[in-house]
Every structure is written in C-alpha cells, then in structure tokens.
From Swiss-Prot:
<feature type="region of interest" description="Framework-2">
    <location>
        <begin position="54"/>
        <end position="70"/>
    </location>
</feature>
<dbReference type="GO" id="GO:0003823">
    <property type="term" value="F:antigen binding"/>
</dbReference>
<dbReference type="InterPro" id="IPR003599">
    <property type="entry name" value="Ig_sub"/>
</dbReference>
<comment type="function">
    <text>V region of the variable domain of immunoglobulin light chains that participates in the antigen recognition. Immunoglobulins, also known as antibodies, are membrane-bound or secreted glycoproteins produced by B lymphocytes. In the recognition phase of humoral immunity, the membrane-bound immunoglobulins serve as receptors which, upon binding of a specific antigen, trigger the clonal expansion and differentiation of B lymphocytes into immunoglobulins-secreting plasma cells.</text>
</comment>
<dbReference type="Pfam" id="PF07686">
    <property type="entry name" value="V-set"/>
</dbReference>
<comment type="subunit">
    <text>Immunoglobulins are composed of two identical heavy chains and two identical light chains; disulfide-linked.</text>
</comment>
<dbReference type="InterPro" id="IPR036179">
    <property type="entry name" value="Ig-like_dom_sf"/>
</dbReference>
<dbReference type="GO" id="GO:0019814">
    <property type="term" value="C:immunoglobulin complex"/>
</dbReference>
<protein>
    <recommendedName>
        <fullName>Immunoglobulin lambda variable 1-40</fullName>
    </recommendedName>
</protein>
<keyword id="KW-1003">Cell membrane</keyword>
<dbReference type="GO" id="GO:0005886">
    <property type="term" value="C:plasma membrane"/>
</dbReference>
<dbReference type="GO" id="GO:0002250">
    <property type="term" value="P:adaptive immune response"/>
</dbReference>
<keyword id="KW-0732">Signal</keyword>
<keyword id="KW-1015">Disulfide bond</keyword>
<feature type="region of interest" description="Complementarity-determining-3">
    <location>
        <begin position="110"/>
        <end position="118"/>
    </location>
</feature>
<dbReference type="GO" id="GO:0005576">
    <property type="term" value="C:extracellular region"/>
</dbReference>
<feature type="signal peptide">
    <location>
        <begin position="1"/>
        <end position="19"/>
    </location>
</feature>
C-alpha cells in the first residue's frame, strides 16, 4: 500500500481588531510517515530574541488547540516524546520524529512580544 505524504498545515489565525501577527511560520510542511519534520517559527528581538518563552499548540480537525510544548522545550504530561521544541536566537522550531497519520493538524507557535504592550 502506497503512503501519501502527510500535510501539516500551519495557519495564522488572528481574531479581533487588536490581533497582530508577529511570528512567522511556513504555510505548510509535509512528510511521509516515519519521517522527521521540522516546523519553524521566526520572530524578532522584541519576542523570541528578547528571551521570551515559545509555546506550541496542536489543533486537530474539529477540536480546540492543545498545548504541545511549553517553555521552549517542555512537554506536558501525555504528549509523546516524538514532539520536541527548541529555540535559538530569534527563532524556534518544533520537530516531529516518526511522523504518524494522526499528526496531521494545524500547529501554532506563541510567544510574548514587548512591542505590543501598552
């Protein structure tokens, strides 16, 4: 049986007039089952580069977002160790090893931004 590549769709959703997108993610990342994929999150000196933590969320179709990684690289209880997070400079990344069909979802990165306070 031939496997079709999985498509991990990354969407930037903003709601409300106050919302501003300050972190950049690729529109999509794809990989075959069993492979390792990395999702990037690029920020600036006012958020990731300022030392603020990065958090990652996974949203499966028809469900609310679920916390996947907190504090750059920590996994909540119940999250498989196939998921890992890292941060360097003004960017962060989420790695998924041993990609599985159930990993097809939307993934979001989040961080505090000092330029938006006030």
């Amino acid at each position: 049986m031939a496997w079709s590549p999985l498509l991990l769709t990354l969407l930037a959703h903003c709601t409300g007039s106050w919302a501003q997108s300050v972190l950049t993610q690729p529109p999509s990342v794809s990989g075959a089952p069993g492979q390792r994929v990395t999702i990037s999150c690029t920020g600036s000196s006012s958020n990731i580069g300022a030392g603020y933590d990065v958090h990652w969320y996974q949203q499966l179709p028809g469900t609310a977002p679920k916390l996947l990684i907190y504090g750059n690289s920590n996994r909540p209880s119940g999250v498989p160790d196939r998921f890992s997070g890292s941060k360097s400079g003004t960017s962060a990344s989420l790695a998924i090893t041993g990609l599985q069909a159930e990993d097809e979802a939307d993934y979001y990165c989040q961080s505090y931004d000092s330029s938006l306070s006030g």
